[in-house]
Design a protein with these regions (language model features):
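ATP/NTP phosphate-donor binding region
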Residues: 1-26, 254
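Gly/Ser/Thr-rich loops at beta-strand to alpha-helix junctions
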Residues: 36-44, 104-105, 212-216, 252-255
Length: 307
């Protein structure tokens, strides 16, 4: 075991991700798989980052969390850990995964690049193609889980599941990953968002702008409203003049509303099918790779790890 970091995951910084990636590459030949203990708060971000940064690693990497301290009744960390080790021992394909038991007792295997942060007032995690590994009411020392009894059958089924197709992407070699800079600004839409209060300094390399569930943001209805401080359109013009790309997400598919079309015409770059956590960390990694704005946009649409 290697204690690389000992901190609340709330205090995670980009430099900590670099340490994780380098540590795994450093010990790559020593193990058949890795299990990383991680807090729940920033789990989805770390899982997404590692799914990309370790896309060339040929062994499985699991992130394990617990919603409660391990010595408290009802904590799911013990089961999450056990199932992760079982899957590694059974020969699951290489890739980055998260095993997590939700409050309803069902345990799921997640593609690290598809994991979404827990919702408000919830300890559960979801992803679009999660595989249910079954139900276990309680994991005790010395007691085999139902998972272990059907392990070989599980693993063969999982190998055919798209969640284990992370190697189908192009992959990127980040064994010598450089510094991750905090030069990506994230904005979430809300009623009353005043774009004139947003300062675009020279250190901002890209902006990621969230959207409402219908893939829209405020752009105003009338010509006058489209020029107001609440409209995204003047902000897009400012970013274009400063040569700062604005990436909009989540976009399930092509814009269905006129506001979405106007955003694209004003220069917004849509990214389809990825979580906001993945879009953010992928944009960060584009900076490490030294990609200019033009290459950033094409890189976001490139499949690296099945994201």
């Amino acid at each position: 075991a290697v204690q690389l970091l000992n901190l609340d995951s709330t205090n995670m910084e980009p430099s900590h991700w670099k340490l994780m990636v380098h540590a795994i590459w450093e010990h790559y030949d020593d193990f058949d798989g890795f299990v990383i203990a991680h807090g729940t708060d920033t789990l989805a971000y770390t899982a997404s980052l590692l799914a990309l940064a370790l896309s060339k690693v040929e062994i499985p990497v699991f992130l394990v969390s617990s919603q409660l301290p391990l010595n408290q009744e009802g904590a799911n960390g013990n089961e999450n850990f056990r199932r992760s080790v079982e899957l590694i021992c059974a020969g699951i394909h290489s890739g980055v995964y998260v095993v997590y038991r939700n409050e309803d007792g069902r345990c799921f295997l997640h593609h690290g690049g598809h994991l979404v942060s827990s919702g408000d007032y919830s300890n559960d995690f979801y992803s679009r193609d999660a595989v249910c590994l079954g139900e276990v009411s309680k994991v005790m020392e010395g007691e085999c889980s139902r998972a272990a009894m059907h392990l070989n059958q599980w693993t063969e089924e999982l190998k055919r599941d798209k969640i284990c197709s992370q190697r189908n992407g192009n992959g990127i070699d980040l064994s010598r990953m450089g510094e991750l800079k905090s030069d990506v600004l994230c904005i979430e839409p809300y009623v009353g968002l005043n774009y004139q209060q947003i300062v675009l300094n020279k250190e901002i390399r890209a902006v990621i702008h969230g959207l409402y569930h219908s893939a829209t943001a405020c752009i105003g209805g009338t010509n006058e409203e489209q020029k107001s401080e609440y409209s995204m359109l003047p902000f897009l013009m400012r970013c274009r003049e400063a040569r700062i790309p604005v990436i909009v997400t989540p976009c399930p598919n092509e814009a269905a509303y006129a506001s979405g079309v106007w955003m694209m015409e004003a220069g917004a770059v849509p990214v389809y099918g990825m979580t906001k956590e993945m879009v953010y960390v992928k944009t960060l990694l584009a900076g490490v790779l030294g990609y200019p704005n033009e290459k950033l946009c094409s890189f976001l649409k490139e499949d690296v790890c099945g994201e």
